[in-house]
């Protein structure tokens, strides 16, 4: 397992437990392991109850954190992938298709970063091209045609900023998705599972409900990008994060996010199954409420929700 800098003391204890577990088991060894286990639990509860916003960002990028493909088979069943935008190509930074959630059909779409070097290159580190956004929109329109709810998983450092992406209409593709998603006639639930950065996240992030995993973030720019603009150096990222209000808890307070999905102690990477179960429960609950509304009622609430963003008050 990989550890972050603020987890060094937890690593020391877990290394000791691992070392002792390989020793011949006797009463003394078992007792020592139990003591260390209790100490580890207390340390973890203390550490994760007072995380800084920057530490939350670090957890959202943890190399062992579950990505969309990891969660797909744990949350849904009977997934059938659909490919291509029917105009240019098949962007592998986004994966989508038909699936079942608790035996009910849904259209699921998610950004995939890739785990190792080969898969990261294959999925372009989760940075979508215009054809990716058009592919996602094609699947959403298909879901609308067959009256299926849509569930999107957001995990990206941003839309791909390359010249070819700009030539193929990156900004138009994202803007088109914002327009079309705001008027879809089926329930739409969006979940930030890691990084939700800039227009790259917004391109599949407009819906009736926006959920976030506990240790994820949602922002118009990365902390490093913000620090580079304000302080001319990315090294100030940890400082600017605190004032950006980009973590799940802060965004829930600001009523940008509808619900925060709890993660296992220590983060989602420590228990994929529990994380997936929490996501499944949260999504199913939201879809149940949304499915009971009429199209007119649901779209009116979606419109009111979107128009409420950007409120301000004088200090």
From Swiss-Prot:
Class in the EC hierarchy, top level: transferase
E.C. numbers: 2.1.3.15
Catalysed reactions listed for this entry: N(6)-carboxybiotinyl-L-lysyl-[protein] + acetyl-CoA = N(6)-biotinyl-L-lysyl-[protein] + malonyl-CoA
Keyword hit for Transferase: yes
Compartment(s) where it occurs, according to its Swiss-Prot or TrEMBL record: Cytoplasm
Positions of disulphide bridges: none
Chain ranges of the CoA carboxyltransferase C-terminal domain: 36-289
Main location: cytoplasm
Keywords annotated in UniProt: ATP-binding, Cytoplasm, Fatty acid biosynthesis, Fatty acid metabolism, Lipid biosynthesis, Lipid metabolism, Nucleotide-binding, Transferase
Domain of life: Bacteria
A GO term, aspect molecular function: carboxyl- or carbamoyltransferase activity
GO BP terms: fatty acid biosynthetic process; malonyl-CoA biosynthetic process
Pathway: Lipid metabolism; malonyl-CoA biosynthesis; malonyl-CoA from acetyl-CoA: step 1/1
Transmembrane segments: none
Record-linked Gene3D superfamilies: 2-enoyl-CoA Hydratase, Chain A, domain 1
Pfam families, per database record: ACCA
GO cellular component, one term: acetyl-CoA carboxylase complex
Role according to the record: Component of the acetyl coenzyme A carboxylase (ACC) complex. First, biotin carboxylase catalyzes the carboxylation of biotin on its carrier protein (BCCP) and then the CO(2) group is transferred by the carboxyltransferase to acetyl-CoA to form malonyl-CoA.
Subunit structure: Acetyl-CoA carboxylase is a heterohexamer composed of biotin carboxyl carrier protein (AccB), biotin carboxylase (AccC) and two subunits each of ACCase subunit alpha (AccA) and ACCase subunit beta (AccD).
Protein family membership: Belongs to the AccA family.
Protein known as: Acetyl-coenzyme A carboxylase carboxyl transferase subunit alpha
Originating organism: Francisella philomiragia subsp. philomiragia (strain ATCC 25017 / CCUG 19701 / FSC 153 / O#319-036)
């Amino acid at each position: 397992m990989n550890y972050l800098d603020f987890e060094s003391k937890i690593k020391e204890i877990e290394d000791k437990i691992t070392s002792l577990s390989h020793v011949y088991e006797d009463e003394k060894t078992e007792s020592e392991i139990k003591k260390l286990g209790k100490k580890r639990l207390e340390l973890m509860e203390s550490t994760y109850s007072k995380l800084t916003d920057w530490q939350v960002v670090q957890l959202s990028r943890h190399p062992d954190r579950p990505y969309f493909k990891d969660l797909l088979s744990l949350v849904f069943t009977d997934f059938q992938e659909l490919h291509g935008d029917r105009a240019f190509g098949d962007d592998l930074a986004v994966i989508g298709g038909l699936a079942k959630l608790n035996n009910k059909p849904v259209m699921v779409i998610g950004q995939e970063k890739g785990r190792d070097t080969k898969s990261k290159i294959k999925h372009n580190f989760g940075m979508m091209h215009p054809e990716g956004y058009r592919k996602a929109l094609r699947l959403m329109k298909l879901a609308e045609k067959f009256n299926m709810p849509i569930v999107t998983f957001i995990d990206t450092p941003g839309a791909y900023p390359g010249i070819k992406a700009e030539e193929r209409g990156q900004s138009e593709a994202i803007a088109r998705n914002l327009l079309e998603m705001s008027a879809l006639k089926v329930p739409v639930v969006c979940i930030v599972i890691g990084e939700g950065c800039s227009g790259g996240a917004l391109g599949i992030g407009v819906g009736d409900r926006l959920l976030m995993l506990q240790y994820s973030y949602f922002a118009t720019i990365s902390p490093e990008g913000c620090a580079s603009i304000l302080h001319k150096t990315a090294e100030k990222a940890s400082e600017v994060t605190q004032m950006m209000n980009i973590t799940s808890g802060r965004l829930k307070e600001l009523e940008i996010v509808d619900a925060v999905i709890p993660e296992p102690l220590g983060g989602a990477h420590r228990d994929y199954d529990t994380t997936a179960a929490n996501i499944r429960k949260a999504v199913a609950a939201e879809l149940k409420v949304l499915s009971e509304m009429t199209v007119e009622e649901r779209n009116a609430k979606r419109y009111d929700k979107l128009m409420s963003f950007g409120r301000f008050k004088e200090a």
